[in-house]
Amino acid sequence: LVYMGPYSFYLHCVYSETLFMMLIAVFFYYLKKEKGNINNYWISAAAAMLASCTRIVGVILVFPLVLQMYLDLYEGRITFGKLGSFIVHMFKNPVKILQVFLCPAGIFVNMMHLYYVTGDAWAFRNVQAAWREDGAGWIGNMIWDFFNNIYAERYWIPLVMILAIIVYVYMLKCRYYSEVLFAVITLIIPFTGGVMSMCRFIAGSYVVYIGLYDYFADKKDLKWLG
């Protein structure tokens, strides 16, 4: 699925996608392996730290980690009534607090590198001004233009986004809560500027491939695709 996808060319370019996706795979694998095993949280936290060092969006992995800790503590049930007791539980377990803080630590290494190379530790944010005006317009206009000019290359962006959302809804039904949380936040990020990189964010988050694999693997006629 990864190498046959339309955006697999990112994996062959001089980008960090390949390393980033590998770290995400490691993160979620150990996050779900032997649920509640605190040693696996260490591996996931280390993978998240390296991911945040590789790409800034890796910082978001801290949220799936916290959510999975919550789910493991309360046997997969999400209730706001347990939120207070969960916070108390976290403060009583400094090891878990350390694991949570370890996740975004890589961004500081990234910022130090940027400061050394460019003299601007916030270069990853400030450089976005170069891509703000991508001409794609708001998502509503893009969807409208897509149906009026289906052959325009940029108008496939909303279609890819809609298909990704469908996959995420399916994953929610299958109780992939941590994965979907990461995917949704990653999906929101491009809206802070232009949406030119929307497809790259969707493919690079790796989560959509987990959902597609789960779906195809459950279908006898399509099992070979999974």
For each of these PLM feature ranges, what is it?
Residues 1-31, 41, 50-61, 199-206:
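Multi-pass, polyprenyl lipid-linked donor-dependent membrane glycosyltransferases
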Residues 5-6, 44-47, 162-167, 183-190, ...:
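Hydrophobic, membrane-inserted alpha-helices
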Residues 7-12, 110-114, 182-197, 211:
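Transmembrane-helix signature of polytopic, lipid-linked glycan biosynthesis machinery
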Residues 26-33, 64-72, 167, 206-223:
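Transmembrane alpha-helices and membrane-interface helical segments
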Residues 34-43, 151-155, 174-180, 219-224:
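Membrane-helix interface segments
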Residues 50-51, 58-182:
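Membrane-lumen/periplasm interface segments of specific transmembrane helices
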Residues 100-104, 218-226:
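Signature aromatic-anchored transmembrane alpha helix within multi-pass, membrane-resident enzymes
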Residues 170-192, 201, 205, 225:
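Transmembrane alpha-helix segments characteristic
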